[in-house]
């Protein structure tokens, strides 16, 4: 082992982020070993062994200034990152180096970012619900504690805002710890998130040990190697907290950029692309990441992942591969956003395996199904209304349409994180209130109220108050 660690090689080829390094034949690094550039902070990760002592690596950083003949040493281990309490309140990059200008991360323990998923007998399924305070999510696609949730949506329909609101509602109320992995997203959003967390005291500037969140960023201006591995860095920190017996929230924004970075790396390594240009190992790469995001008998990881949907096509291989791993899917729709209804969650497309009378209870289950039936009927009648108008509908259909439009508006809600833009204070709605409100609308107890009374309110009582003002 000492022989491998001391191994020194030299660069023989450099094409963009791909660097080929030659080592003595008896000292070949293993796949995923981290190599260090001598005289530079750059780290290379071994991806392939080409034979004759040559390995192909991906640069985890800018490869500007590299040239043939430069010396490279093998660390003899995979990339290791600091874990534990010292990471709380800090912003780190893919290698676990701090990027918040607050000095080194003084962690007692470091862990490799590549590790096996927990064994089958260690897993612990949970049926406990995680209340989010967002009506449409709690009613239609409730989250399981220790489950995996995907926020699916095209460009500009509100994935990041929904993610921020979930962090705001869950991370503050949740006594456990959170890990946020910014994978290939805008630097501005990472900056906004940090300040948002500082303002809400989830990050305590005066005493970082009191903080509740660790942040790992690999933004969209970074090389593909960084974006591909940064999700694993965040996950490793989350796993270490879980293995201490804690309940952890793991946020990923955006899982699609992880796939995209894999596509770039795959192309750079010369692999033959598969459907739509994705890497041939897409399902395997996604599975390796997702299988590690799981709850064990010791602690739990509840994961919320934003998933960009290219060209609003849910059948694209990337979102389609992600679907298979999730317990709940929150689908954001451009059509609903265009009506001015936010959060723009599609109540007919979004699903959760928790919607089962044995898990959520009969009342919740029946209310959810009744709401979906009314909305489905409205969807079927929309074409008839567009051609013939409302007057041609049967009385019961007119009633269904009126209730559906009220439900649609009542599914909207002002967010805490959007107060600056909307001017109205954010609302947190408890699950009991959500069920009571929708039950009343479906039962016809709100038929006398105008539909605009339901727009951007919290509980059903607020809708009644708003109706009085309108009338």
UniProtKB/Swiss-Prot annotation:
GO-annotated cellular components: plasma membrane; proton-transporting ATP synthase complex
Family annotation (Pfam families): ATP-synt_ab, ATP-synt_ab_N, ATP-synt_VA_C
Major location (coarse): membrane
UniProt enzyme class: translocase
Organism superkingdom: Bacteria
Keyword RNA-binding: no
Catalyzed reactions per annotation: ATP + H2O + 4 H(+)(in) = ADP + phosphate + 5 H(+)(out)
GO molecular function terms attached to this record: ATP binding; ATP hydrolysis activity; proton-transporting ATP synthase activity, rotational mechanism
Protein localization: Cell inner membrane
Binding site for ATP: 153-160
Keyword Cell inner membrane attributed: yes
Signal peptide location: none
E.C. numbers: 7.1.2.2
Membrane topology annotation: Peripheral membrane protein
UniProt keywords, alphabetically: ATP synthesis, ATP-binding, Cell inner membrane, Cell membrane, CF(1), Hydrogen ion transport, Ion transport, Membrane, Nucleotide-binding, Translocase, Transport
Biological role stated in the UniProt entry: Produces ATP from ADP in the presence of a proton gradient across the membrane. The catalytic sites are hosted primarily by the beta subunits.
Family according to the record: Belongs to the ATPase alpha/beta chains family.
Protein name in UniProt: ATP synthase subunit beta
Gene (name only): atpD
């Amino acid at each position: 082992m000492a022989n491998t660690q001391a191994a020194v090689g030299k660069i023989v080829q450099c094409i963009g982020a791909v660097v080929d390094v030659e080592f003595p034949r008896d000292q070949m690094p293993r796949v995923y070993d981290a190599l260090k550039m001598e005289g530079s902070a750059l780290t290379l990760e071994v991806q392939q062994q080409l034979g004759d002592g040559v390995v192909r690596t991906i640069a985890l950083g800018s490869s500007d200034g590299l040239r043939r003949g430069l010396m490279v040493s093998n660390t003899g281990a995979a990339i290791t990152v600091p874990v534990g309490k010292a990471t709380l309140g800090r912003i780190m990059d893919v290698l676990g180096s701090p990027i918040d200008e607050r000095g080194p991360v003084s962690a007692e323990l470091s862990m490799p970012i590549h590790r096996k998923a927990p064994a089958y007998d260690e897993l612990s399924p949970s049926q406990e619900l995680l209340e989010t305070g967002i009506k449409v999510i709690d009613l239609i696609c409730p989250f399981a504690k220790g489950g995996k949730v995907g926020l699916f949506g095209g460009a500009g329909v509100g994935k990041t805002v929904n993610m921020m609101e979930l962090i705001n509602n869950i991370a503050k109320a949740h006594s456990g710890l959170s890990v946020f992995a910014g994978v290939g997203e805008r630097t501005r959003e990472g900056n906004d998130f940090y300040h948002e967390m500082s303002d809400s005291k989830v990050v305590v500037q005066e005493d970082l040990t009191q903080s509740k969140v660790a942040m790992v960023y690999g933004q969209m201006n970074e090389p593909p190697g960084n974006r591909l591995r940064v999700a694993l860095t965040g996950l490793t920190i989350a796993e270490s907290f879980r293995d201490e017996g804690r309940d952890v929230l793991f946020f990923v924004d955006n899982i699609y950029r992880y796939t995209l970075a894999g596509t770039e790396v795959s192309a750079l390594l010369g692999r033959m692309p598969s459907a739509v240009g994705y890497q041939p190992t897409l399902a395997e790469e996604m599975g390796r990441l997702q299988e590690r995001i799981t709850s064990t008998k010791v602690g739990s990881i509840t994961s919320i992942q934003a998933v960009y949907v290219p060209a609003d096509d849910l059948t694209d291989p990337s979102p389609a591969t992600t679907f298979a791993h999730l317990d709940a899917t929150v689908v954001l729709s451009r059509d609903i956003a265009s009506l001015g209804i936010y959060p723009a969650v599609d109540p007919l497309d979004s699903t959760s395996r928790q919607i089962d009378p044995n898990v959520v209870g009969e009342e919740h289950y029946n209310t959810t199904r009744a709401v979906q039936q009314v909305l489905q009927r409205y969807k079927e009648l929309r074409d008839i209304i567009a051609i013939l108008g409302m007057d041609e509908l049967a009385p019961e259909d007119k009633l269904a349409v009126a209730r559906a439009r009220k439900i649609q508006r009542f599914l909207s809600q002002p967010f805490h994180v959007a107060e600056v833009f909307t001017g109205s204070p954010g609302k947190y709605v408890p699950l009991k209130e959500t069920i009571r409100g929708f039950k009343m609308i479906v039962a016809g107890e709100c038929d006398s109220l105008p539909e605009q009374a339901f727009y951007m309110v919290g509980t059903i009582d607020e809708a009644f108050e708003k109706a009085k003002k309108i009338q």
